[in-house]
Curated annotation (Swiss-Prot):
The keyword Transmembrane applies. The modification FMN phosphoryl threonine is found at T177. This is Ion-translocating oxidoreductase complex subunit D. PANTHER family: ELECTRON TRANSPORT COMPLEX PROTEIN RNFD (PTHR30578), ION-TRANSLOCATING OXIDOREDUCTASE COMPLEX SUBUNIT D (PTHR30578:SF0).
Length: 356
């Protein structure tokens, strides 16, 4: 007989988890549809395929462990992982890339550690990082952001399905992201670079399309803060640290500049990472002070990887995984002592008690 393995209180623990997970899914909707507006229906195909794959792999793993499948699937944690994988991978990427990422996230990064609540690393970011290292070409084929109302600029639904399931190239639609452009043109003054690159020139504050995607995920994150799904400490400290690092090394656009603070805040996966990845309660820190340190170090690492790191343009996934590894260490030194417990007395301390 399949037995339930949940901690007390048993009355509403599972229901609360499923409610919070659904709130996270709802909060991704503004960013998801903004991405669809600028990148086409490939975003929705990604999310749908990754979500179904994650739920299927979750069900298979739970069944193999002889647990009640329906009960554990209804916590919707696998659905959240699928949505995050779907919006993290490039639209129009091959179908097998999404299924491989779902397998890595659910089976290797989650269920092998014991399931939800036991995984030390964020499953979606483990999948993203392994796919990026293993398939760098497929993982960097981002479509150029063009509004859907511009005819012929993005593939339609049928073309999208053909590209996803046949592996047809998207050379006519793909190109470098804003972070790629900045990183690969270090010798140019930013003013000249903005004039030469339409992706930068068409942007209002950062880069065309991506700035609105980040604003949409920001609104989703603020909604989660309003609903008290998590506290402000980790996301805000990450954004402040990233902006501070960018401000320290920004010199008004010389050839050695790597973008303004606003550019880094509204480009790439910044807001998605801050409000939907860094805030993962399982793989992050638990103390308030620890969350501030955890988020700030992630923000600093994101800037370091973006600016001086390897050929990978965005550093959110690698920064998060590095700090997942360091989270227990941070908690060890920042978690307050239990009320009533004091530091152990030294053996040499012979202070008399009660006057004796």
């Amino acid at each position: 007989m399949a037995l339930l393995n949940i901690t007390s209180p048993h009355a509403q623990g599972a229901n609360r988890t499923s409610r919070l997970m659904l709130l996270v899914v709802y909060a991704t909707i503004p960013g998801m549809f903004t991405m669809t507006w600028f990148f086409g229906p490939g975003v929705l195909v990604n999310v749908l395929l990754a979500s179904i794959s994650c739920m299927l792999f979750e069900a298979l793993a739970i069944k193999a462990r002889q647990r009640p499948v329906g009960f554990y699937l209804r916590d919707f944690s696998a659905l959240v992982t699928g949505v995050l994988i779907g919006v993290s991978l490039p639209p129009y990427c091959p179908w097998w890339l999404l299924i491989s990422g779902s397998f890595i996230a659910i089976i290797l990064a989650k269920q092998l550690y014991g399931g939800m609540g036991f995984n030390p690393f964020n499953p979606a970011m483990v999948a993203y990082a392994l796919l990026l290292v293993s398939f760098p070409v497929e993982m960097t084929q981002w479509a150029q952001p063009k509004p859907l109302w511009v005819d012929g600029q993005l593939p339609g639904l049928m073309d999208t399905l053909a590209k996803v399931f046949s592996g047809a190239p998207i050379d006519g639609y793909s190109g470098a992201t804003a972070l790629d452009i900045i990183k690969q043109n270090k010798g140019l003054v930013l003013g000249d670079l903005y004039q030469q690159q339409p992706l930068l020139a068409e942007g209002r504050w950062a880069s065309a399309g991506w700035e609105w995607v980040n604003i949409a995920f920001l609104f989703g994150g603020l909604y989660l803060l309003y609903k008290k799904v998590y506290t402000w400490h980790a996301p805000v400290s990450m954004l402040l640290a990233l902006a501070l690092m960018a401000a320290l090394f920004y010199d008004s656009g010389s050839s050695s500049s790597s973008g303004s603070p606003l550019f880094h805040l509204l480009t790439g996966a910044t807001m998605l990472g801050a409000f939907f990845i860094v805030t993962d309660p399982v793989s992050s820190t638990v103390s308030t002070k620890g969350r501030v340190i955890y988020g700030a170090l992630i923000g600093m690492l994101v800037y370091v990887i973006r600016t001086w790191g390897s050929s990978y343009p965005d550093g959110v996934a690698f920064a998060v995984l590095l700090m997942n590894f360091a989270a227990p260490f941070i908690d060890y030194y920042t978690t307050p002592r239990t009320y009533g417990h004091k530091k152990p007395r030294r053996a040499t301390d012979s202070t008399p008690r009660n006057g004796h």
